């Protein structure tokens, strides 16, 4: 096999690969063996005709397709390795020369991993990030605990809806006297004053009693997310089926004993404050790291192939689809709800995808420049962390499987973490 390489443009190369006639002839024999049973030739049982006879009846090129695939599948990866090329897309294959007794020659034009010109990534300066724990943060956490432990009581039939009550309702919505999709619900629990429903829907239920039917008039926002409803006036026929009230427990030492491991309110407040501080510190650390990494990326120069951005957008769309699936929504429904299309979403994702690709390329180049590697032990430790997240009872076995099946991913994760640490450790926080 002979391989020559020509640079076509930035990040695009063309390989010319010459496969010896002997090798191509072997590929033709394999193609014949694979396809011979498909041919009916007079004078021969099906699948028994010699190659020469089949070619005479069906043409010289009848076995070329599979022979070409066999040759390319074998030689293309070797050509990439010989020329130390890392492709980021599938190649465009063109046949240059082919024929019985001849060398098989083809070209493969492919987009390759771009070159990265690193700028400064050590000695970077970024503003120090910190978040104080406020008294209101602690109070809000206590109120959330209070809400979670509220007792729900059903109000008497003659009692009316008040703000903060939970109304169990049936409703049906109309626009221009016509019911609209998604405008109907049964036994829906609506907390009055929560702002769950649009406009002043909830306020119009205040004062209503169990068994009462109300007509509620609203106007949808101009940017509601549905072409059918944007800016439209609507009315809802609402039936009040039940009214409930939340009885909030007092936030005192007795409450603390019931909902936590502590005996006094002061002890719980200190614990809440410590946990909020821990979360704030993690947030500040992550934001500082992101700022410094962004600076390192801004200082680097790289011409990113469009196909890499498109591939990243594809990954982002798959992630979105998976998250939506957990909520029982598919992409088409999501597009309808958000008054969008796949094309619009892809365009919206493009900036973030480009940033992700550049960050990955820059971090990989820093790792190369600093000769950072991941040991087998580090990869196994990361696999164990992942296995713990899966909640696997057989930690060692699961970790071993992950270390084998996800080796490249785990290795990249470990190396990236080292790169981030190196850049951050060599940076300077400024006030």
UniProtKB/Swiss-Prot annotation:
<keyword id="KW-0697">Rotamase</keyword>
<keyword id="KW-0143">Chaperone</keyword>
<protein>
    <recommendedName>
        <fullName>Trigger factor</fullName>
        <ecNumber>5.2.1.8</ecNumber>
    </recommendedName>
</protein>
<comment type="similarity">
    <text>Belongs to the FKBP-type PPIase family. Tig subfamily.</text>
</comment>
<dbReference type="GO" id="GO:0051083">
    <property type="term" value="P:'de novo' cotranslational protein folding"/>
</dbReference>
<dbReference type="Pfam" id="PF00254">
    <property type="entry name" value="FKBP_C"/>
</dbReference>
<dbReference type="InterPro" id="IPR008880">
    <property type="entry name" value="Trigger_fac_C"/>
</dbReference>
<dbReference type="GO" id="GO:0044183">
    <property type="term" value="F:protein folding chaperone"/>
</dbReference>
<dbReference type="GO" id="GO:0061077">
    <property type="term" value="P:chaperone-mediated protein folding"/>
</dbReference>
<dbReference type="InterPro" id="IPR027304">
    <property type="entry name" value="Trigger_fact/SurA_dom_sf"/>
</dbReference>
<keyword id="KW-0132">Cell division</keyword>
<dbReference type="Pfam" id="PF05697">
    <property type="entry name" value="Trigger_N"/>
</dbReference>
<dbReference type="InterPro" id="IPR037041">
    <property type="entry name" value="Trigger_fac_C_sf"/>
</dbReference>
<dbReference type="InterPro" id="IPR005215">
    <property type="entry name" value="Trig_fac"/>
</dbReference>
<dbReference type="GO" id="GO:0043335">
    <property type="term" value="P:protein unfolding"/>
</dbReference>
<keyword id="KW-0413">Isomerase</keyword>
<dbReference type="InterPro" id="IPR001179">
    <property type="entry name" value="PPIase_FKBP_dom"/>
</dbReference>
<keyword id="KW-0131">Cell cycle</keyword>
<dbReference type="GO" id="GO:0015031">
    <property type="term" value="P:protein transport"/>
</dbReference>
<dbReference type="InterPro" id="IPR036611">
    <property type="entry name" value="Trigger_fac_ribosome-bd_sf"/>
</dbReference>
<dbReference type="GO" id="GO:0051301">
    <property type="term" value="P:cell division"/>
</dbReference>
<keyword id="KW-0963">Cytoplasm</keyword>
<dbReference type="InterPro" id="IPR046357">
    <property type="entry name" value="PPIase_dom_sf"/>
</dbReference>
<dbReference type="GO" id="GO:0003755">
    <property type="term" value="F:peptidyl-prolyl cis-trans isomerase activity"/>
</dbReference>
<dbReference type="InterPro" id="IPR008881">
    <property type="entry name" value="Trigger_fac_ribosome-bd_bac"/>
</dbReference>
<dbReference type="GO" id="GO:0005737">
    <property type="term" value="C:cytoplasm"/>
</dbReference>
<dbReference type="GO" id="GO:0043022">
    <property type="term" value="F:ribosome binding"/>
</dbReference>
<feature type="domain" description="PPIase FKBP-type">
    <location>
        <begin position="164"/>
        <end position="249"/>
    </location>
</feature>
<dbReference type="Pfam" id="PF05698">
    <property type="entry name" value="Trigger_C"/>
</dbReference>
<comment type="function">
    <text>Involved in protein export. Acts as a chaperone by maintaining the newly synthesized protein in an open conformation. Functions as a peptidyl-prolyl cis-trans isomerase.</text>
</comment>
């Amino acid at each position: 096999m002979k391989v020559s390489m020509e640079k076509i443009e930035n990040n695009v190369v063309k390989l010319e690969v010459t496969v010896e006639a002997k090798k191509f002839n072997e590929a033709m024999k394999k193609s014949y063996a694979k396809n011979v049973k498909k041919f009916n030739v007079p004078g021969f049982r099906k699948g028994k005709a010699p190659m020469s006879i089949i070619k005479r009846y069906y043409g010289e090129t009848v076995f070329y397709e599979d022979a070409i695939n066999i040759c390319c599948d074998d030689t293309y990866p070797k050509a990439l390795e010989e020329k130390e090329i890392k492709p980021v897309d599938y190649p465009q294959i063109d046949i240059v020369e082919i024929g019985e007794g001849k060398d098989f020659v083809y070209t493969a034009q492919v987009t390759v991993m771009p070159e990265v010109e690193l700028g400064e990534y050590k000695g970077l300066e970024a503003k120090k990030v910190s978040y104080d724990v406020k008294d209101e943060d602690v109070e809000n956490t206590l109120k959330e605990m209070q809400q979670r432990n509220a007792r729900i009581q059903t109000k008497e039939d003659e009692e009316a809806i008040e703000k903060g009550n939970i109304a169990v309702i049936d409703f049906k919505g109309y626009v221009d006297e016509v019911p609209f999709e998604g405008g109907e619900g049964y036994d829906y629990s609506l907390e009055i004053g929560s702002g769950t429903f649009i406009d002043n829907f909830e306020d119009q239920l205040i004062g209503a009693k169990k068994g009462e039917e109300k007509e509620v008039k609203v106007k949808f926002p101009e940017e509601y997310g549905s072409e059918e409803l944007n800016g439209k006036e609507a009315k809802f026929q609402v039936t009040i089926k039940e009214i409930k009230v939340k009885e909030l427990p007092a936030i005192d030492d007795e409450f603390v004993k019931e909902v936590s491991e502590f005996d006094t309110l002061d002890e719980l407040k200190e614990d809440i404050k410590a946990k909020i501080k821990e979360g704030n510190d993690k947030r500040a650390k992550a934001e500082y790291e992101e700022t410094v990494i962004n600076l390192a990326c801004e200082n680097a120069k790289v011409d990113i192939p469009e196909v890499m951005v498109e591939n990243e957008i594809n990954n982002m769309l798959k992630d979105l689809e998976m998250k939506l699936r957990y909520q029982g929504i598919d992409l088409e429904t999501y597009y309808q709800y958000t008054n969008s299309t796949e094309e619009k979403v892809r365009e919206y994702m493009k900036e973030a995808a480009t940033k992700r690709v550049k960050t990955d390329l820059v971090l990989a180049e820093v790792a190369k420049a600093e000769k950072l590697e991941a040991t087998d032990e580090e990869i196994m430790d990361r696999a164990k962390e992942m296995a713990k997240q899966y909640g696997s009872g057989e930690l060692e076995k699961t970790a071993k499987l992950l270390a084998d099946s996800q080796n490249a991913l785990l290795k990249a994760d470990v190396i990236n973490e080292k790169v981030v640490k190196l850049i951050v450790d060599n940076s300077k926080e400024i006030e």
